[in-house]
């Protein structure tokens, strides 16, 4: 009698339609891992039990004039933000904080992702609508209206596009710089399937900070991220961006509260420093809907302070660590802007 594993690996009798479905990537049904060795782990992460929200994670409903204006401008120009799509808890503060300066992170390439990471609430499809050709110009117009000096551009994954959307990304950066050369641009990119040409296209467009998130520690990648993403590939993306432009500021982010150990967090931070990543942010994972991975632990503010200290000791130029910190949270704050200006002067471009 053939073993169960052998039967699972035999694709010769799978219908053509099913083989195409597998090749195109996972749908929601594929998130149910059927391996017997994974059942106990999956029960922990997908059970109906939810941890009560601690007081330090409760935020206010956004109602400021700055928030309302930014929201209206986005709708009029048909733009998307990761702040909304990912249900970020900081949207009220970033869009209309005490300073009155909007710091929304613009999401290009549409609002539909070709991947289905188990922590993310952005909608998914195997073949999303084509990118809006007017989006680069509309994004630049909106940013010029807001009068910002620092902006974060991010995107969904677009595995359906031959270049992963890198040229669209680059065009958006160029349109922004065309209207305001002094504006600092941070790009938070997907992994582009590890395509070095795509990474170089974005870097060479004139970005000031190149960010790509490893999201979680190595041993939890399979549980948290889409199967097409992996730890080593993310490290290679960050490493190659630095090879293309050694003076480029590189940045990444890790979510905590998914069941990671202190040892695995420390090793991840060491791995990132080994490839000269400059900036790191650490924040609490928040379950966006009941269909996503459950929170395993609400990490205390004191523990986040510990990791900020560790980051500084390891040599990161900038470490932001806190329960509500996200990869683009207060990205344009004073220290990071100064770091970028310093690198630009070293490169002779400031």
UniProtKB/Swiss-Prot annotation:
Enzyme Commission no: 2.8.1.8
Protein name per the record: Lipoyl synthase, mitochondrial
Annotated catalysed reactions: [[Fe-S] cluster scaffold protein carrying a second [4Fe-4S](2+) cluster] + N(6)-octanoyl-L-lysyl-[protein] + 2 oxidized [2Fe-2S]-[ferredoxin] + 2 S-adenosyl-L-methionine + 4 H(+) = [[Fe-S] cluster scaffold protein] + N(6)-[(R)-dihydrolipoyl]-L-lysyl-[protein] + 4 Fe(3+) + 2 hydrogen sulfide + 2 5'-deoxyadenosine + 2 L-methionine + 2 reduced [2Fe-2S]-[ferredoxin]
UniProt: [4Fe-4S] cluster 2 binding residues: 113, 117, 120
PANTHER family (UniProt xref): LIPOYL SYNTHASE, LIPOYL SYNTHASE, MITOCHONDRIAL
Primary location group: mitochondrion
Pathway: Protein modification; protein lipoylation via endogenous pathway; protein N(6)-(lipoyl)lysine from octanoyl-[acyl-carrier-protein]: step 2/2
Gene3D superfamilies in alphabetical order: Aldolase class I
Further remarks about this protein from its record: This protein may be expected to contain an N-terminal transit peptide but none has been predicted.
Binding site for [4Fe-4S] cluster 1: 83, 88, 94, 328
Keyword DNA-binding recorded: no
Co-factor binding comment: Binds 2 [4Fe-4S] clusters per subunit. One cluster is coordinated with 3 cysteines and an exchangeable S-adenosyl-L-methionine.
Keywords of the record: 4Fe-4S, Iron, Iron-sulfur, Metal-binding, Mitochondrion, S-adenosyl-L-methionine, Transferase
Compartments reported by the entry: Mitochondrion
Pfam families given in the database record: LIAS_N (PF16881), Radical_SAM (PF04055)
The organism's place on the tree of life at top rank: Eukaryota
InterPro entries assigned to the protein according to its UniProt record, in alphabetical order: Aldolase_TIM, Elp3/MiaA/NifB-like_rSAM, LIAS_N, Lipoyl_synth, rSAM
Native source species: Trichoplax adhaerens (Trichoplax reptans)
Keyword Transferase assigned: yes
């Amino acid at each position: 009698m053939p073993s169960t594993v052998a039967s699972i690996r035999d694709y010769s009798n799978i219908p053509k339609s099913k083989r195409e479905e597998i090749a195109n990537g996972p749908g929601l049904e594929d998130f149910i891992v059927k391996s017997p060795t994974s059942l106990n782990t999956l029960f922990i992460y997908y059970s109906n039990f939810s941890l009560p929200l601690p007081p330090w994670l409760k935020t206010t409903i956004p109602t400021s004039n700055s928030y309302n204006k930014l929201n209206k401008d986005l709708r009029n120009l048909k733009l998307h933000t990761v702040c909304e799509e990912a249900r970020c808890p900081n949207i009220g503060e970033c869009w209309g904080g005490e300073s009155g300066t909007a710091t929304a992170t613009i999401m290009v390439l549409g609002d539909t992702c070709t991947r289905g990471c188990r922590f993310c609430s952005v909608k998914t499809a195997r073949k999303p609508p084509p990118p809006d050709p007017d989006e680069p110009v509309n994004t630049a117009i909106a940013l010029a209206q807001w009068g910002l000096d620092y902006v974060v551009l991010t995107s969904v994954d677009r595995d359906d596009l031959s270049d992963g959307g890198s040229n669209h990304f680059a065009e958006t950066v160029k349109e922004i710089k065309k209207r305001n050369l002094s504006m600092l641009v941070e790009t938070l990119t997907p992994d582009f399937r590890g395509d070095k040409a795509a990474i170089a296209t974005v870097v060479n467009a004139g970005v000031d900070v190149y960010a790509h998130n490893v999201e979680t520690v190595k041993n939890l990648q399979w549980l948290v991220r889409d199967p097409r993403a992996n730890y080593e590939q993310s490290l290679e993306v960050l490493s190659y961006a630095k090879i293309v432009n050694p003076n480029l500021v590189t940045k990444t982010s890790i979510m905590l509260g998914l069941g990671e150990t202190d040892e695995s967090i420390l090793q991840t931070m060491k791995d990132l420093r080994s490839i000269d990543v400059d900036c790191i942010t650490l924040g609490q994972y928040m379950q966006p809907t009941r269909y996503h991975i459950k929170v395993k632990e609400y990490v205390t503010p004191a523990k986040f302070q510990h990791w900020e200290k560790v980051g500084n000791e390891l040599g990161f130029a900038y470490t932001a660590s806190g329960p509500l910190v996200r990869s683009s949270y207060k990205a344009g704050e004073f220290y990071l802007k100064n770091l970028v200006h310093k690198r630009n002067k070293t490169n002779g471009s400031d």
